[in-house]
């Protein structure tokens, strides 16, 4: 029986051997080494050379130069340092002031129209301005579509009184109140500081002369005899019949005693006679 190597002679690593008999039938033979020791050592050296050699890349090397982490510069940006001259600074400040003033004016015009009363001088006429820019003495500071109608208001028809304290005394009109004639002298309203007092005159029958008022009053009529009164009707007074209106009643007025059974009370009787009083019937 002869065994042949399956594959290339001396280069096969397979341990399987296929024997060939006379009838050229193939049989497998295991665990049979056909290679020599020299060939095996040569294969080990080739493997060591493969592992020790550096890897060879198929592509050419692509190296990017790294100069550090930097932000790429804008090619459109100016590369020279920016320096401000005094002329540029003044121009920028003026531009900023103009922009701020225009912004404030636009904000003021967006609001609702407000009525502003202004009087520049004490002697100048009062002016009424409805919205828009400030109005001077008949001259608009700004002209154009933004200007509002200017309405001059004469002095006599102003909404507010003119400046300055103008104190006027009350008119010289005598006033009659409650039978007292009061006359106030024209002048300053502060009468207490100057010592001016109002002149008060009382008509006839005033509290200063009570006798005149008592004499002018009609005689008090006597009441007719009333049954049940303990006193006679000659000593009881009735109130007067609607006397004239007097704001200062000083004289006492006699009233009739109430209708009750018993001795009358002293405050209700102006004149009473003790001899004419009789004891009540239930005391007898």
UniProtKB/Swiss-Prot annotation:
Residues 59-80, 97-119, 143-171 are annotated as: Disordered. Disulfide bonds: none annotated. InterPro entries: DUF4645. It holds the Pfam family DUF4645. It comes from the Eukaryota. This is Proline-rich protein 32.
